[in-house]
Structure formats: structure tokens, C-alpha cells
Amino acid sequence: MEYKITKEELGNDWLYSTLVALNKCMAEHGLPLYVVDARARDVAMKLMKGDEPKRRTEDLDVAIAIEDWQTFDDICKTLENNHFKRHGETQKFFYKGVNGDLDFEVDIVPFGGVAVDEKIGWPPEGNPVMSVKCFQDVMNEAVTVIVNGEIEVKMAPLCGQFLIKLDTWNDRNASTDKDAEDMLFILKNYLDIQLLYQKDNVPPDVVTFDNESLDAIIWGAQWLAYDISKLLTTEHLQFYADLASAELKKEEKSNLIYHFMKYYGNSEMGDFSSNYEPCRQIWSVFVKIFSKELEERKKQ
């Protein structure tokens, strides 16, 4: 699938200039440029006429598929030779522009053969560690975005963006709940976007529009869970089914459900206890649809 967006629609000259420079650098290594995380979400919402996120991002996260750290070092050198300044020995760069008048933050996330046990440990010490478990599955379904008719970038589909956020939440939920906020934002927009662009492809026997007692967000969860279930390998599908199931078993003690409750809405004076049931129901949908897909694969 291919989308087009103009520089004006992108709405950020620094971002555009950074994408142009990154695209040039990655092309030198024969690598596609994958845009992920919050910036991918923001661009997707512009392309698909979704809601504007309340929490805007001021940086850019990109992913690259590489086999070893030597390739990563070579890419870093190319970036530094093209007006990117590296922050220490980390994956963080700042694009300074040809004239040195920019300062746009970029995080480079490697995945693929460079990962060990589907995790990235930054050299030389091998930390911090982050999961890239779902990255290959997601990037296999990446959509193409042509920016201003000049540059081509790959972007995780919305269902893949949700999954990357779930991975990130699983890594750091003890210290932050912002990944749950991002997941919930995608979920709240998912049904409307799918009905706008995929209205003739409603998953059969999955999205229960005939059950009018359900909130629209549950229909969105059904569709989102279905799309994710078709994107994942069986091993990864089992992992995320187990993750969601384990959180449901914790009931009110679940961090995942609690974080969703905080951002679900309908709370007064900081009391969001009434959000427990709809948030529990959302994750029950994921477990049900993931489990159904796993059972169907066993029969094949």
C-alpha cells in the first residue's frame, strides 16, 4: 500500500529536511528507512484524517534492519558525514542541517540479525536493553509513504504501531504509562479509520456490529486484534496472547489495565475506577481473537 503526503501536509520543515538527509544516508547502504513510534502515528493520522494526538512528539524514531554492529557503526559514520551529530555512543543523533541551523533529534533503532533473543543491547556494555520482538513481523507489512514526491520511506501500519507500543510498554511499564496512552489513542481511532479505508473488508465473524450493547471502541479492538493476529508469526502471536492473558488474571492489580483506565476517559477528580470493566473487556477481546487464530493455525 502506498500513500502520498506533501511537505506542507507534513507540517514540519525540520522533520522534512531530516527525512531527506536520512533517506540519502540509508540509500548509500542500500537500506530502506522505516519510520516508527510516535512520529509514525502522527503521520498516519494526517494521512488517514484521524484525530490529532494530545501529546505531540518533537523527535523522530527510525528503524533499520541490519545483521551486525559493524554495519551500525558504518551507518553512524555516514550520518556524521552528513550533518548528523551523535550524542555520545548511543543511538541518538541530532540533525544540524547543511547550514548548521537545525537541531532535530533522531533515534536509530536496529533490528534483524543484530538482535540477540529478539532484544537489542547497546554496545559496548550491552545495555540498556530493548525488545524488538515484533519489528520484523511489523516491517514485513510496512506501508510506503512518498513525501513531497521526492523521498520514499516505509512506515509501520497502525496495527503494527500498536504492537510496537505494547512491546515498549512491556519493557518499561514500571516507570512510565505513556505507552498505554499511545496504544489507547490508536485504538480509539482504529475503527473510524478502518471504516473509511477498509469498509469493504470488515473481518468476517470478528467485528460484531450486530451487538449494539458494545461500545464502538470494542468493535475497534476486535478489528485491531484481528489485524495484529494476521500479522504475527505463530510464536509471537502466542507470546502476546500469553502477555495479555497474564495481565487479565491480575484483575485490578494489572498495570496494563490500570494504565488504560487512566487514559480511557470518563473519570472525575482522578477517580477512574469506573473504567475498569471497559478496559478489561478490551484486553479480553485481544486474548479471545489471538487464541482463536492460534487454534485455527493448529488445524492447518
Regions found by a protein language model. Name each.
Residues M1-Q300:
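Compositionally biased terminal segments of proteins
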